[in-house]
């Protein structure tokens, strides 16, 4: 599982609008590049190779929206609260994520799941695949936890 987390520069209307424009741009830009990923490791490798390009794309979008700040882009393990995506709820915890911080990063944030893709256009079949993937993932985690008890 790999999440994407975008933190706005501030909570001003302009900065929140920029965050949403950056979100739309990155989701549209990354989707075709991650479409063929068959594992979280493969997705992570592609993201690692594209960190500079992701930052450049983010900064271009900020500038196009008349923002006067930069961005930092990191790939790592970050804390997330409980989050529901449609019928799927992810528990609180540490997750691999692409974190994009706009400017000072003091504004409200937005997140989604890049792999499996929960922040791209979805179909009923894709939703079923994602539910199966997450259900399988949590079953494996539960088995490992029970084995260590």
Regions found by a protein language model. Name each.
Residues 135, 146-149:
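Extended, compositionally biased alpha-helical segments that mediate assembly or anchoring
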Residues 88-141:
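Soluble extracytoplasmic domains of inner/organellar membrane proteins
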Residues 7-11, 76-78, 103-105, 115-118:
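Solvent-exposed coil/turn segments that connect beta secondary-structure elements
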Residues 9, 25-37, 53-65, 118-121, ...:
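Structured segments of extracytoplasmic/periplasmic soluble domains
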Residues 41-101, 105-107:
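Mid-length scaffold segments of soluble, non-membrane domains
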Residues 13-15, 82, 109, 121:
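Intrinsically disordered, low-complexity acidic/polar segments
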Residues 1-47:
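Early exported N-terminus immediately downstream of N-terminal targeting peptides
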């Amino acid at each position: 599982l790999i999440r994407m987390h975008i933190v706005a520069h501030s909570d001003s209307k302009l900065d929140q609008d920029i965050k949403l424009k950056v979100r739309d741009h990155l989701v549209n830009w990354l989707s075709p590049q991650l479409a063929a990923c068959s594992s979280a490791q493969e997705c992570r490798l592609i993201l690692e190779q594209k960190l500079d390009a992701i930052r450049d794309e983010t900064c271009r979008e900020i500038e196009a929206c008349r923002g006067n700040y930069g961005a930092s882009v990191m790939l790592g393990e970050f804390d997330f609260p409980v989050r529901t995506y449609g019928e799927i709820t992810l528990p609180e915890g540490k997750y691999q994520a692409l974190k994009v911080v706009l400017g000072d990063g003091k504004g409200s944030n937005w997140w989604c799941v890049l792999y499996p893709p929960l922040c791209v256009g979805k179909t009923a079949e894709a939703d079923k695949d994602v539910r199966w993937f997450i259900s399988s993932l949590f079953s494996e985690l539960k088995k490992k936890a029970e084995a260590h008890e």
